[in-house]
Amino acid sequence: MHIKTLTVSQLNRYVKNTLDADFILNNASVKGEISNLKIHSSGHIYFSLKDGGSKINCVMFKSYAYNLKFVPENGMDVVALGNVSVYEKEGSYQLYVKDMKREGIGDLYVAFEKLKEKLKEEGLFDDVHKKEIPKFSKKVGVITSPTGAALKDIINVTKRRNKGIELLIYPALVQGTDASRTLIEGIKILNKVEDVDIIILARGGGSIEELWAFNNEELAYAVYNSKKPIITGVGHETDFTIVDFVSDRRAPTPSAAAEIAVFDREVLINEILNYKYNIKNSMENIIKEKRSYLNLYKQKIEANSPTNIIVNEYKNIDNLKELLNMKIEGKLNKEKNNLSRLSSLLEAHNPLNVLKKGYTLIEDEGNNLITEKESLKKLNKINIIFKDGRAKLSIEYIEEF
């Protein structure tokens, strides 16, 4: 029987193809303890999984590592899901991990979902029960660890946003068997402080075991029954606990919870100044508009007042007088012109003007004009009219031509 000779590369590739074609090895779920852990700067995670008798090399690439819900550590028991394949260059097989969960965590998730569904059915998550978050709190109660980073973050945010806000801190355990009890006590005590306006329930990030105190059923009811509104800021943005669903407002981090509870003094001052400016402008515009209406009505009233009516009538009378004077003057001028024309015409026909040429007029003693000699026969005396006077003459004789 002839045996084909393979190169090392061919052999490794053959083994790789064989493993890649195996259904079980392509969907492997492996339980073991993490060792030789190395989290590379690229984001890839290299480690080994071991049990009492063996170990296997593992790699988890950045795109999968990003979705992990915990930070892997040496000695941690986990269940890794992935596929077995060969790294051809080294000729070694390894587990390419796509997801990983802490051993025993599955039971916690089951308990979490079971309690979540129970409280949801009881109505603890309904929005109708959410209390309104006060916009301008004066005193904020804080329930958290007195030595944790969460408290430092809340204090820093409060100082930055409004130094006038008072923080009343209730020191509580935030993990461990007694943590839920101290958190419940904190809620009860702060509810008795009359001038506390709002409560922050907070802690920093951690694994599901470390945050488990906030998944307690009694704590959930304490949050639900609180007379004062509660903001939860537990863990990081991706961490959700039971109290987050029950609380009146869930913040992704303790710092974000403080941002919600503590109003920004500078922002408020700017808002007040803006309101003041807008009100001032609005009032000025209203006053300006009303003043225009007032002036308009004033003008109408003045126009219709008895004094103005009399003044206007006087003006009308003056105008009529002026018009009448103009018409009279025009009529007089016209008549004067006519008179002058007629005078000229009369003057032109004045018989006395003939006397200026050397002619005379003869009248009887009754001042009747004599134009025929026959009229003289009955007269003894006549009047002779010259251009510059008259004379009385006696008739001595009458001569006929």
From Swiss-Prot:
It holds the Pfam family Exonuc_VII_L. GO terms for molecular function: exodeoxyribonuclease VII activity; nucleic acid binding. InterPro entries: Exonuc_VII_L, Exonuc_VII_lsu_C, OB-fold_nuc-bd_dom. Coiled coil: none annotated. Keywords: Cytoplasm, Exonuclease, Hydrolase, Nuclease. It catalyses: Exonucleolytic cleavage in either 5'- to 3'- or 3'- to 5'-direction to yield nucleoside 5'-phosphates. It is found in: Cytoplasm. It is an enzyme of class 3 (hydrolase). Heterooligomer composed of large and small subunits. Bidirectionally degrades single-stranded DNA into large acid-insoluble oligonucleotides, which are then degraded further into small acid-soluble oligonucleotides. HAMAP family: Exonuc_7_L. This is Exodeoxyribonuclease 7 large subunit. It comes from Clostridium botulinum (strain Kyoto / Type A2). The gene is xseA.
